[in-house]
Each structure stands twice: as structure tokens, then as C-alpha cells.
Amino acid sequence: MALKCGIVGLPNVGKSTLFNCLSSAKAQAANFPFCTIEPNVGVITVPDERLTRLAELVHPGRIVPATCEIVDIAGLVKGASKGEGLGNKFLGNIRETDAIIHVLRCFEDENITHVDGTIDPIRDKEIIDTELQLKDLETIESQLAKVQKTAAAGNKDAKVLAGVLMAYKEVLEQGKNARVVTFDSKEEQDAARNLFLLTSKPVLYVCNVSEAEAKDGNEFTKKIEAMAADEGAEAMVIAAKTEEDIAELESYEDKQLFLEEFGLEESGVNRLIKKAYALLNLQTFITAGEMEVKAWTYKKGWKAPQCAGVIHTDFEKGFIRAEVIKYDDYIQYGSEAAVREAGKMGIEGKDYVVQDGDIMHFRFNV
């Protein structure tokens, strides 16, 4: 299950700098691989110190982290929803992503011009929001035209869909994003999910600040954080220029020293990837053996058979049981055999809800 995030933002906000830093993040993840699929698409590893700790005990042939696909989505201008600039391509690329990383300029620099002449991240956010909302309204109105007659004739599914469409239409016409709407019934939730609205996607607002403000942010970032909370989104502070400097350093030790100088415990890039992962309610279970220590991505709340299916569909179909070791127990006892001997290995059935960091071994029969 690969996570796909799209990075968006107006020109000169630091979007491409941030993407380039993400492209260089291989050096911060113990030389895990980074590859470029297209010039604007990269696959990057999800930082997870647990894999390194386990590898020190297991001595596997390789370490395989979870991955995240990052797409640098072409900049847009006002009128993108009507196809101006790179509008149609921009909006099409966003539709294919699971989550949006929205970079906002929260720094002053007279050498870097702003497309609108002044620094105002709230205004910048609203420009992109408006384009996405207009495109969503277009989708809603097109669907409504098709479904209203069927709903009026008494079709139950059409009635549910029409109700969902009208709820979205109301908030979008108020200049709000679709993600603020919630539905109670499973039928409504399914209908909403199948619309693939742009403004219903989870969003992480990334406040790009100066190096001096990397730790505590500024007045701009406080406004963005408050606004994000109001719409059920996430926000974080990052200094793309600082991240660019970190990316140029060769060793892990040099990077850590650099971070300490700025009073930072972890690079902004690492924090960003982890936040994006959490944004989609994704978690990690681990398999550990002589061949490899590997992270597997699953949705929070999934049960053991569903997680087995992440490895192979046959594992889910023929699921018998799962042998589960808690990460802390593995670290404490030092090996699978020692965990067994201490009676700390759990034998779980099909109703077991997998927890983040569980070390799993699945028994199945095909």
C-alpha cells in the first residue's frame, strides 16, 4: 500500500526546494533508496528507527522500509479550474493523490518576489482552495444533473447520493472545503468517497519560514495553524532553505550537528513524511527474519487477516493465526527465541486489531 502525496503551492513559495530536499532524504534514512519515476515524481522512504534497531539484533540481508510517493505538482495561477496556466494538468494530478502537502510562504525576502506582491499565506491558501472548490462544484453539479431524476423516482441509492451531493454543494458555495462535511451512515460515507472530490482529500499545510524561525515559527504560521485546526487539517513549520543545507551534508553525524545548532531534534523533511503518513491513518507492522527486516503499511484499525493480505492475497484467504511480538519486547529480549521463552509472543486470531510496530508472523493454509 503506497502512499501518494502531491506537493502544491503558488510560485516562489519554496515548493520545488522542498521537493528537492525530499529527493535527497535518502541520506537521512541510512542509505535507503530513492528513485525518480519521472522528473517530478520520487519514491522516498518513511523514516522508522525501529527497523535499524531490529536489524542490529537480527542481522538481515537487507532492510526494506515503507515508502511514500511524492509528486511535485506543477504550479497554478488564478483560473486553473477553467484551464488557465497548467490548470487542467494540475487538477488532474491532484485527483490521483491520496493527500495534499500545501506549501505556504511564511517568510519575508525582498530578493524573492511573490506572485501577488506581498506575503500573505492565508490569501495564498484561499487562491488554491478556490480553484479546487470550483472544480469540485463542477463535479457536483454534473453528478446532480444525472441523479436527481432517478432520486425523484424513488431509487434509494440515488436518494442517498443526491443528499450527499447537496451537502457538499452547500459548503462549497460558502467557500469551504469538502473535508469539513461529515456523514453518519455507511451508505453516505461510501457515496462521498466515490466522488473523489479534490477538497475532501486530507491536507497538510507546510509553513515555509526563514532559518531563524525554523524552531518556533512566526505570526504567519500561528494564523495558518489556527485555520488548519478549524477545518480539521494539519499544519507544520519547516525552513526549506535549512533543509536544503542539511541535504547537502554527507554524513548522518554532520546532519545531526547541524540540527542541534538550530535547536531541532529532527529534520523537517523527516517530520513531514511522518505527518503525511499519519494524515492518512497509516501505520506499520514489521516482519523480521534472516533475509530481511521489512516495514509493511496498513490502515489503522485493520485486523490480522487484512494485514496478512498486504503481504500476499493468499495469506488473507487462508489465514489461520498470527504470531505477534511487541516491538519493545523484541528489543528487551533480543531475539524471537528469547521472546517465546519468556512467554511474550501472542497467538492471535482473525479478530486481532494490529497495532503500530507489531512484529508479525502469519500462519496460513491455501
Give the label of every model feature segment:
Residues 1-113, 141-143, 147:
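Conserved G1/Walker A P-loop phosphate-binding module
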Residues 2-8, 13, 19, 146-353, ...:
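C-terminal-of-GTPase-core extension/linker across diverse P-loop GTPases
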Residues 24-25, 50-51, 75-77, 105-111, ...:
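Conserved nucleotide-binding/hydrolysis micro-motifs of P-loop NTPases
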Residues 34, 48-51, 64-70, 84-98, ...:
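Amphipathic alpha-helical transducer elements in NTP-driven molecular machines
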Residues 76-82, 117-132, 151-156, 212, ...:
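Flexible beta-alpha connector loops of hexameric P-loop NTPases
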Residues 95, 99-102, 107-135, 139-142, ...:
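Switch/coupling subdomain of P-loop NTPase systems
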